[in-house]
Amino acid sequence: MMKDIVIIGAGFAARQLIRQLRKLDAHCPIRLITADSGDEYNKPDLSHVMSLQQHADDLTKMQATAFAEENRIALQANTRVTAIDRNAQQVVCGTDRYDYHKLVFATGASAIVPPIPGREHMLTLNSQQEYRTHEARLWQAERVLVLGAGLIGTELAMDLSRAGKRVTLVDCASSILPALMPPEVSARLQFTLTQQGVSLLLNTTVQQLEKTETGVQARFTDGRTVEVDEIISAVGLQANTQLAKAADLAVQKGIQTNAQLQTPDPQIYALGDCAEIGGKLLPFLQPIQLSAITLAKNLLGASEALTLPPMLVKIKTPLFPLQMAGDTTGSDLHWQQEWNEQGMVAKALDSQQRLRAFVVGGERMKEAFPLLRQLSATI
């Protein structure tokens, strides 16, 4: 009897992989093990729940049992994996053991909470379950501090503000989206946030949190203080690698794999936010989709290398949305910006005047696809 392909985790990466496997093979045995309910939801929707007045259960697109039945898989929901026995090729879940032919880590990533005094007063919104846990507090809150002005923090700040909250957005950098684009390119979105009423505190970060009679006082490294009702940590994600590390697999920023998504153990693979593919983390939907297509083939006997074209990344800030592609943080690039009443197009050119990256914003988002084709031709 053929052993299972066992997948640990039930997020976007795992579901994409299962669907791709079923396109290629209707009968190969697949077992999905997840510590949560395994219900399907769209994680990017978490950035818009407050303005859309959605509760956690509203996000569910498909129950886990229905997904399992539709794709003919064995489902172990609400089941925590405690160890991997590589010699026996078994996944250990307490007293239960499951044999595997191939094993896939799709364990995702967890939100980072800075190790500061009062960190217990912070909450995170990195999953449907986390939102379910905290939604009552967020609905009641009038003053919200968002720590981290990256992609998720910026999206959350705008959403909370549009929902009528008084929002403070804090980052140690001098501009928003510092890991994604230079300040001159993010400036219009930054202006839009302030026009919406978001208070921006840049070049500083939270040093200490202290509970008061009327909220939580945040003290910053520059000496300022702000009292709020809730604090959301959006400073970044850390790949969930503990299980892989305990199994003596190679781990750095994520679970290390080659271009075939394979770890040094030829029976074990990694996919999604937990995977470090060729030294890179790729925590966006499109590379995960393409990775799932490649991995499905490899689990069934192929040896395909993942190749990724230039891909669009969307910053979902409805009052001034952005799309970007390419090496937007390259230090040797020259940016050309073009503005009109419809929005912005910013192009990053190299020394040979070749397009290496771009950002489009506002109503000029429709120009992204022609630029993406141009970018693909030059890379």
From Swiss-Prot:
Subcellular location field: Cytoplasm
MF-aspect GO terms: oxidoreductase activity, acting on iron-sulfur proteins as donors, NAD or NADP as acceptor
InterPro entries the record matches: FAD-bd_OxRdtase (IPR050260), FAD/NAD-bd_sf (IPR036188), FAD/NAD-binding_dom (IPR023753), NO_rdtase_NorW (IPR023961), Rbx-bd (IPR041364)
Keyword set includes Oxidoreductase: yes
Residue ranges of coiled coil: none
Gene3D superfamilies listed in its UniProt record: 3.30.390.120, FAD/NAD(P)-binding domain
Superkingdom, natural source: Bacteria
Major location category of this protein: cytoplasm
Pathway noted in the entry: Nitrogen metabolism; nitric oxide reduction
SUPFAM superfamilies, per database record: FAD/NAD(P)-binding domain (SSF51905)
Catalytic activity reported: 2 reduced [nitric oxide reductase rubredoxin domain] + NAD(+) + H(+) = 2 oxidized [nitric oxide reductase rubredoxin domain] + NADH
Root EC class: oxidoreductase
Function comment: One of at least two accessory proteins for anaerobic nitric oxide (NO) reductase. Reduces the rubredoxin moiety of NO reductase.
Stated family: Belongs to the FAD-dependent oxidoreductase family.
Protein name: Nitric oxide reductase FlRd-NAD(+) reductase
Lineage, broadest ranks: Bacteria, Pseudomonadati, Pseudomonadota, Gammaproteobacteria, Enterobacterales
Gene: norW
